[in-house]
Protein backbone atom coordinates (compact mmCIF):
# COMPACT_ATOMS: atom_id res chain seq x y z
CA UNK A 1 0.00 0.00 0.00
CA UNK A 2 2.36 2.66 1.24
CA UNK A 3 5.46 3.12 -0.85
CA UNK A 4 6.82 6.06 1.13
CA UNK A 5 6.11 6.23 4.84
CA UNK A 6 7.13 9.89 4.99
CA UNK A 7 4.26 10.90 2.71
CA UNK A 8 1.97 8.21 4.02
CA UNK A 9 1.98 9.52 7.58
CA UNK A 10 -0.94 11.71 8.68
CA UNK A 11 -0.16 15.42 8.70
CA UNK A 12 2.44 15.04 5.99
CA UNK A 13 2.44 16.27 2.39
CA UNK A 14 0.15 13.74 0.75
CA UNK A 15 -1.86 11.15 2.63
CA UNK A 16 -3.47 10.24 -0.68
CA UNK A 17 -0.15 8.84 -1.85
CA UNK A 18 -0.68 6.07 0.68
CA UNK A 19 -3.57 4.74 -1.40
CA UNK A 20 -1.74 4.91 -4.70
Curated annotation (Swiss-Prot):
Expressed by the venom gland. It is found in: Secreted. Contains 4 disulfide bonds. One of its GO terms (molecular function) is toxin activity. One of its GO terms (cellular component) is extracellular region. Residues 11-20 have a biased composition (Polar residues). Keywords: Disulfide bond, Secreted, Toxin. Residues 1-20 are annotated as: Disordered. It comes from the Eukaryota. Has a vascular smooth muscle contracting activity. Causes short-lived contractions of both arterial and venous rabbit vessels. This is U27-ctenitoxin-Pn1a. It comes from Phoneutria nigriventer (Brazilian armed spider). The lineage of its organism: Eukaryota, Metazoa, Ecdysozoa, Arthropoda, Chelicerata.
Amino acid sequence: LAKRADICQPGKTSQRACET
